[in-house]
Amino acid sequence: MATPSFGVRSTAGQVKDLLAPDAILVSVSKGIEKGTSLRMTQIIREVTEDKWPVVALSGPSHAEEVARQVPTAVVSACPDQTAAEVVQDLFINDHFRVYSSSDVIGVELGAALKNVMALCTGCCTGMGLGDNTKAMLMTRGLAETARLGTALGARKDTFAGLAGMGDLIVTCTSMNSRNYRAGILIGQGTPVQEAIRKIGAVVEGYYAVDSARELAAQVGVEMPITLAAYDVLYRDRDPREVLLSLMRREKRHEIEETWF
């Protein structure tokens, strides 16, 4: 299934009666559902009554480059390792390398939250800030993603892999990224909704930041960068003021128990 996150539920409902008994469902959608805080594979499993294994296929893989057969690596993740390895075998080839994982929670959270961080780094580019600021937001953004993930049962080392750090790097630095480009426009002063319209495609980070904020509140996890992004995107706060508030947070030790 390769739909925007808000279309996964309806799409799963449309196809569930067409599936063979031995089917394996593969989701390449990235996000967290608004209102339910469910990941994409959770939605599919719920709608299909958990009758089929659902695999998340994710990683640093801009479609434009995959189509050109640029060497790429991703992760096939499912608690059912047999299903993950079947998908691995189906997709792996000389230009598309696939690793398997049982940590679907970590893989899907990394996929969803990297879009939020890409909006942030794009905003920094739009404001004319340097590489230092973007590196700070990417690194600390990954830290809070790992913090949320481990609270929900993910393995912390997943966030150092392709679906975590890998996807974060490619999405936060490339003009192929819709979220990064939208962030640039916002940083240049374009109103949020106008920036999204100008991109002309779904900006998943806009939806993910609200869902991630709700999910973090549910499990009591601190996510300051995600909340800062929410303030800019939903409360029309000035990005420079929000960044300054992040810089003025209480000092702390860098390495956490949930970090690498």
Pin down the residues of each PLM region.
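Rossmann-like NAD(P)(H) cofactor-binding subdomain of soluble oxidoreductases
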Residues: 1-71, 87
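Conserved residues at beta->alpha junctions
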Residues: 2-3, 31, 78, 173, ...
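Internal alpha-helical scaffold of NAD(P)-dependent oxidoreductase catalytic cores
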Residues: 7, 18, 43-53, 71-158
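Generic structural signal for well-ordered, non-membrane alpha-helical segments
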Residues: 8, 33, 37, 41, ...
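General beta-strand structural signal in soluble alpha/beta enzymes
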Residues: 27, 53-58, 98-102, 223-225
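Alpha-helical transmembrane segments of multi-pass membrane proteins, especially transporters
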Residues: 30, 56, 135, 139, ...
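NAD(P)-dependent Rossmann-like dehydrogenase/reductase catalytic/cofactor-binding core
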Residues: 121-125, 150-160, 164-260
